[in-house]
Amino acid sequence: MKKILVTGGTGFIGSHTVVSLLKSGHQVVILDNLCNSSINILPRLKTITGQEIPFYQGDIRDREILRRIFAENRIDSVIHFAGLKAVGESVAEPMKYYDNNVSGSLVLAEEMARAGVFKIVFSSSATVYGDPGKVPYTEDMQPGDTTSPYGTSKSMVERILSDIQKADPRWSVILLRYFNPIGAHESGLIGEQPNGIPNNLLPYICQVAAGKLPQLAVFGGDYPTPDGTGMRDYIHVMDLAEGHVAAMQAKSNVAGTHLLNLGSGRASSVLEIIRAFEAASGLTIPYEVKPRRAGDLACFYADPSYAKAQIGWQTQRDLTQMMEDSWRWVSNNPNGYDD
């Protein structure tokens, strides 16, 4: 049984990964500063897993709390989610993103090495590919020109961790580039609760469904896609969580830098997502087509075959289940974790 430190473990993907880790027989310690999550998730995680999870409230840039965590726990590996993730905000406040995401990751890596912990799984993103001009995205594609400081910060941390591993072969660095996580845990107890107006499609749809927003803005209806709207590779958050566990179990004892795409290999359009959500919820989602957003691509999706070959993982849940689980979460928790 391994003890895993999960940074950002009360966030959307982090919390679902905590559930998956515990289900797989691992022990978990969570570090989160709660800047984009709620303390109220902790009793819900206990309800789902039947376990009390050690929680430290703090920041990955805080060496003191990191040293305390490593001193008080025999940590085997770190799964690193902690970071800011709003693309638009990153354009407006780049220094905030580089300080948090890049400097924070560097402090974390330094304190890991100081504690003798050399296994890290990093939550990266398909945004590091930029616009490669072809689909599907494969791991041998070079990172491109990112369209936001958020994407650049992910690319920079990938490079930093890869360089650290080259300099010190004790390290196992696992870089997971994932696509568009949606859905929620099947219990309806945990899900995505963005602060403010959501940046991503499904939380936006959910807020319209809950009556918090009057209609959905669909950015771009003239893309070269079958229905004119942008197409993305959507992945159920529990599939993504299980991908983290599979990658850690398969590769954390193998020195080197391991890069994997985690996606479904299928692209769905904005209108397809709206229709699928309407079918799951029985509601009608009003929407208005607006001009394209700068930097948005027409279509991208993963080639997931390398992940299947390397770690024996592939997605198990289809679009219908993603929508049903999302609707269960939002209908049971109209105010998120604030109920």
UniProtKB/Swiss-Prot annotation:
CDD domains: UDP_G4E_1_SDR_e (cd05247)
Protein name in UniProt: UDP-glucose 4-epimerase
Reaction(s) catalysed (UniProt annotation): UDP-alpha-D-glucose = UDP-alpha-D-galactose
Quaternary structure and interacting proteins, as annotated: Homodimer.
Known EC number: 5.1.3.2
Source lineage: Bacteria, Pseudomonadati, Pseudomonadota, Betaproteobacteria, Neisseriales
GO cellular component entries: cytosol
Gene name per UniProt: galE
Family to which this protein belongs: Belongs to the NAD(P)-dependent epimerase/dehydratase family.
InterPro entries xref list: Epimerase_deHydtase, NAD(P)-bd_dom_sf, UDP_G4E
Organism, scientific name: Neisseria meningitidis serogroup C
Function: Involved in the metabolism of galactose. Plays an essential role in the incorporation of galactose into meningococcal lipopolysaccharide surface molecules, which are important for pathogenesis. Catalyzes the conversion of UDP-galactose (UDP-Gal) to UDP-glucose (UDP-Glc) through a mechanism involving the transient reduction of NAD.
Entry annotated with the keyword NAD: yes
